[in-house]
Amino acid sequence: MGQSKKLNKQPSSLSPLVQLAGIRKCFDGKEVISQLDLTINNGEFLTLLGPSGCGKTTVLRLIAGLETVDSGRIMLDNEDITHVPAENRYVNTVFQSYALFPHMTVFENVAFGLRMQKTPAAEITPRVMEALRMVQLETFAQRKPHQLSGGQQQRVAIARAVVNKPRLLLLDESLSALDYKLRKQMQNELKALQRKLGITFVFVTHDQEEALTMSDRIVVMRDGRIEQDGTPREIYEEPKNLFVAGFIGEINMFNATVIERLDEQRVRANVEGRECNIYVNFAVEPGQKLHVLLRPEDLRVEEINDDNHAEGLIGYVRERNYKGMTLESVVELENGKMVMVSEFFNEDDPDFDHSLDQKMAINWVESWEVVLADEEHK
């Protein structure tokens, strides 16, 4: 986090595929999407991320043509498709339930869309088998859906969508029904498939780890509005507000009060009772309240024994959780605030496995912090 780390930027040459402008949608008089503007670029994997009820699935359904907008415009390849029926858009959707036909074979499920479009019979078999090869299911063509695992069913649903050669593939929480291990595997497979196909993917999820793993770009939503739009690294390391910071991964939020500005970048502040320098890229005044945000992995801890003195925030270990590669400790500061610290496991370090109630000093690399204005005391 913070200013010393460079962010991976999306190539500036990406061309827009979908443009949503001034989109508004209400259900039963309640506004669920409010003046939303969003551009989706050719060939990217974009994730709409947010809690239940934030409007992300509604946006997906509006793009697909499964819902109609109350106001605003939807453009696909510079063509206005706002009022074009779903079946006439070059868009396919993979739903959470997969919606496979149980009485049809895998081959027939994938071929269904082509038959509905009256595709010449000679084209159907090669196109279906090509789609099944892409998802590594060509040997399963004659099986029925009930003879497949959850992951295989999901791949059939994707093959059925891509066989139509859509410009855009929409995926609505399509991994949420899978168990943890299979979900992790499918995250990698989906991203690899998207690269291979070159089709633009728009993926909807409430799972932030899923979004960080797969996406070229993440759009974080709340209450029908976009809170932040950026690369996974930007969203994780440079959250624009407290909602995004708290929604994406674990984060520690320290209260701070400005003492004085030292230079263009640094401010002297009181952070949870300790005076230190923090990097602040906006105007502040003495006495102003701030939030200093640090991820658990960005904190450094040192045991304090009777014979040594350490600088930093002072606290005591209250919980330890061994996570294989990391040790997560909960440290209670002297003012009662709980702080999460994550350290890479080092069995050769005699001080690594901290005892409960061990006195600790917490520090961080200057400039790794993200500083936000206190939204309640602006």
From Swiss-Prot:
Catalytic activity: ATP + H2O + polyamine-[polyamine-binding protein]Side 1 = ADP + phosphate + polyamineSide 2 + [polyamine-binding protein]Side 1
Bilayer disposition of the protein: Peripheral membrane protein
GO molecular function: ABC-type putrescine transporter activity; ATP binding; ATP hydrolysis activity
EC class (word): translocase
Sorted UniProt keywords: ATP-binding, Cell inner membrane, Cell membrane, Membrane, Nucleotide-binding, Translocase, Transport
Record has Cell membrane as a keyword: yes
Record-annotated ABC transporter domain positions: 18-248
Disulfide bonds: none
InterPro entries hit by this protein: AAA+_ATPase, ABC_SmlMolc_Importer, ABC_transporter-like_ATP-bd, ABC_transporter-like_CS, Mo/tungstate-bd_C_term_dom, P-loop_NTPase, PotA-like, PotA_ATP-bd
Residues engaged in binding ATP: 50-57
GO annotations of cellular component type: ATP-binding cassette (ABC) transporter complex
EC code(s) of this entry: 7.6.2.11
SMART domains reported for this sequence: AAA (SM00382)
UniProt keyword DNA-binding, yes or no: no
Localization per record: Cell inner membrane
Pfam families per UniProt: ABC_tran, TOBE_2
Protein function: Part of the ABC transporter complex PotABCD involved in spermidine/putrescine import. Responsible for energy coupling to the transport system.
Family: Belongs to the ABC transporter superfamily. Spermidine/putrescine importer (TC 3.A.1.11.1) family.
Record's subunit section: The complex is composed of two ATP-binding proteins (PotA), two transmembrane proteins (PotB and PotC) and a solute-binding protein (PotD).
Name listed for the protein in its UniProt record: Spermidine/putrescine import ATP-binding protein PotA
Native source species: Shigella dysenteriae serotype 1 (strain Sd197)
